[in-house]
Amino acid sequence: SIPESVETSVIPSTVVDDYGTKKFLLTLNDGLETESVILPIEGYKKKRHTLCVSSQVGCAMGCDFCQTAQMGLLRNLTTAEIIAQWHAANHALGTKIDNIVFMGMGEPLENLDAVIPAIEILADNNGPAIASSRICVSTVGRIEGIKLLAAMARTDGYKRLSLAFSINAPNDEIRKKIMPLAKAVSMKQLRNAILAYPRHDVGGVLAEYVLIPGVNDSDEHAVEICEYLKPIGCGLNIIPYNPRDNSPWPAPTETSVNRFVAVAKNTGQFVRRRITLGRDAMAACGQLGNTEH
């Protein structure tokens, strides 16, 4: 059950791009809006759907490459407003959701008072019944939040809860230029926190790297980030940059993305390149929070 009442309206199929990616808008009871995205993923035997949920209206982290950051933080979402996103996708839009990723608007670890109960509800066999192994929480690197989420991931029923961390740079110098949080939290401190996160046989931890032309996309950067990740032993997810409004950078070329991935793989690092979905609809990674709907 949803723990508190919530009045939301869903504008179904706000955006549907060529791949079937759906970005939808929730209007909250105070008039603010939050966005969520349904991503169709071709599985081994069938198509699955991942729901990218928001945890805040806006975000305070200020990452230069992210559309949501340009809004600033307006407020945290409640647990009910997080669950309402699943309800809207599953019922109003009629899409069976297989996976949940907390990678929408906001920094989830800045709102754990709502996010942790939301995870409990999503994983409840009497509710959505989404296994914890199919739930992933992403962070830019909030150390205290990682510790709290790690405690949850050590408890029965949540031991396969996954953590993704947005590293986005091969070293502190570059990271500080594009992610203000990096001025307070070094990559070494972040790695130490990640190393303490409980792991399981199918992973549990994933590094995310937004590839930005001329910023973090050289061959040397590829080698450097893989060296940094060696002690962690996690996968590296390469995300081609999706330009925000008034972006100072273009999207990377296919050639540059493929080259970076190849160089990284050559070090022995397990690498995946995220397929870009929803860019034209401003529904891709880093593009939520645009002012025109």
Language-model features: where?
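Radical SAM enzyme core and accessory elements
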Residues: 1, 266, 278-293
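Flexible, acidic/Gly-rich N-terminal and inter-domain linker regions that tether
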Residues: 1-49
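Short, solvent-exposed loop/turn elements at beta->coil junctions and helix N-caps
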Residues: 11-15, 136, 276
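Short, solvent-exposed polar/charged micro-motifs at secondary-structure junctions
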Residues: 17-25, 146-147, 216-217, 248, ...
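Canonical Radical SAM [4Fe-4S] cluster-binding loop centered on the CxxxCxxC motif
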Residues: 42-81
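Conserved alpha-helical substructure of the radical SAM core
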Residues: 70-99
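Conserved AdoMet/S-adenosylmethionine-binding subsite of the radical SAM
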Residues: 90-99, 104-267
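A structural preference for short, hydrophobic beta-strand core positions in alpha/beta folds
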Residues: 238, 273-275
